Amino acid sequence: MRSKKMTHGLEKAPHRSLLHALGLTREELARPLVGVVNAANEVVPGHIHLDDIAEAVKAGVRAAGGTPLEFPAIAVCDGLAMNHEGMRFSLPSRELIADSIEIMATAHPFDALVFIPNCDKSVPGMLMAMLRLDVPSVMVSGGPMLAGATLAGRADLITVFEGVGRVQRGDMTEAELDELVEGACPGCGSCAGMFTANSMNCLAETIGLALPGNGTTPAVTAARIRLAKHAGMKVMEMLERNIRPRDIVTEKAVANAVAVDMALGCSTNTVLHLPAVFAEAGLDLTLDIFDKVSRKTPNLCKLSPAGHHHIQDLHAAGGIPAVMAELDSIGLIDRSAMTVTGRTVGENLDALGAKVRDADVIRSVDAPYSPQGGIAILKGSLAPGGAVVKQSAVAPEMMVREAVARVFDSEEAACEAIMGGRIKAGDAIVIRYEGPKGGPGMREMLTPTSAIAGMGLGADVALITDGRFSGGTRGAAIGHVSPEAAEGGPIGLVQEGDRIRIDIPARALDLLVDEDELARRRAVFVPVEKEITSPLLRRYARMVSSAATGARQR
């Protein structure tokens, strides 16, 4: 066992002395030592309850004959970090989470690990660490928040974001917004729609690194506590059988994850996170693979923000196993992929009797919302390296559109124009210098997209950026434009009034300016250089790769 490096042998007597100082007995040190990585904090609603999950995990580890040892991980709430300087630090936290766990689990060689994340970057960060360390591991997340119940009906955080635009437009009073503010987020859990956190938690289950039910079991239920106990017990089985994360994360898992991603209509942030996660296992997930899978995978779900259903509805309809079973019926799931249950995907689906219980929430493959998946990859003269759009959340009128460029070099400048009523139907808002390097940090553009939707412009205005979007964004929001402006990409050459053509079915994004004019602009182009006062962000800007490859740190 790995832990013998610090518990066994004459020369490890000082190590044992330190471990006894923790209150551990000889009997406890004789058992496998299981690290429990807990991202609990009192800042993030999705993490406020994770101590309860950790206690359940530790109970499961002890029940199966192990000794649990808990240590912390950081987590950022993207909602609280939105639309200010803090959002620059969200994506960089992904690698920081992975690195810090690698440090802790190598300095203190545990025999196995249980990972407890919940919100946006904590899930991919922990998955990256899990694959990097490759010791027997299980992930169990904190679970989704329930949707809010308000006088106007069901609500979630995105309802509040869009409410700001509705007040600005005059469709909602500030008193009505206040009522929404207090009711939209009723308690603990990751925000209730198919936003980034829930997208990644569902995909962790799909990949096989979390138990069935991990992605959709509500945070406030006893079933979530039982799931955590089972995770603690299951990691001991993984240790006994020496099943490691890289035994599970193979090309088969990649194919399953991308197919389910497309069927669910997950966040576009999965196009950043999945390549970064799979790279830790030596696997290359490209934009072309995403698009190839999207073209043949039906979109079976329209969860908030694309529709009115929430994660609790997906859970009641059969959850991720039901979605996988539906895709399996047309050969889009590899049933032979291994999982942390110790069984294959196919064996899990059979044992669970996986089936769709509500065909309104999970459509049949014979009657999907769309014959193609939720995400599309666009390329063209404006994005030769690629761009990403959640096509399942785009209004039909915006699938093919020629628009007039309104150019802004920051999110703040664009928001000021939107809120000031200076954006009109037929415009394409271009926000640049918000990419991984140019931001730096690749901020989410949820505030401007929510303002567009709230002001009733969602079917008339596009937003194009080298930044990224929240999983809660809807509309013609095209992000991850590569190369980014700071790297000399064509988005840096766009001028006010240029015409841009969007053709999502044809996967095209083009700047309608002739090549001679672009050459003249390129000859005098000088990228905007921002003053970066944060040492962390300076390092990040130097080390980060393109969004087209997952914005990984080199």
From Swiss-Prot:
Q: Which domain of life is it from?
A: Bacteria
- State the protein's name: Dihydroxy-acid dehydratase
Q: So which cofactors does this thing need? A: [2Fe-2S] cluster; Mg(2+)
Record PROSITE patterns: ILVD_EDD_1, ILVD_EDD_2
Give a GO cellular-component term: cytosol
Which intervals of the chain form a coiled coil? none
What function is annotated for this protein?
A: Functions in the biosynthesis of branched-chain amino acids. Catalyzes the dehydration of (2R,3R)-2,3-dihydroxy-3-methylpentanoate (2,3-dihydroxy-3-methylvalerate) into 2-oxo-3-methylpentanoate (2-oxo-3-methylvalerate) and of (2R)-2,3-dihydroxy-3-methylbutanoate (2,3-dihydroxyisovalerate) into 2-oxo-3-methylbutanoate (2-oxoisovalerate), the penultimate precursor to L-isoleucine and L-valine, respectively.
Keyword terms, alphabetized: 2Fe-2S, Amino-acid biosynthesis, Branched-chain amino acid biosynthesis, Iron, Iron-sulfur, Lyase, Magnesium, Metal-binding
Q: How does it assemble?
A: Homodimer.
Cofactor details (free text): Binds 1 [2Fe-2S] cluster per subunit. This cluster acts as a Lewis acid cofactor.
Name its species: Nitratidesulfovibrio vulgaris (strain DP4)
Tell me which InterPro entries the record gives.
Dihydro-acid_dehy_C, DihydroxyA_deHydtase, DiOHA_6PGluconate_deHydtase_CS, ILV_EDD_C, ILV_EDD_N, IlvD/EDD_N
Would the keyword Lyase turn up in this protein's UniProt record?
yes
Instruction: Name the gene.
Output: ilvD
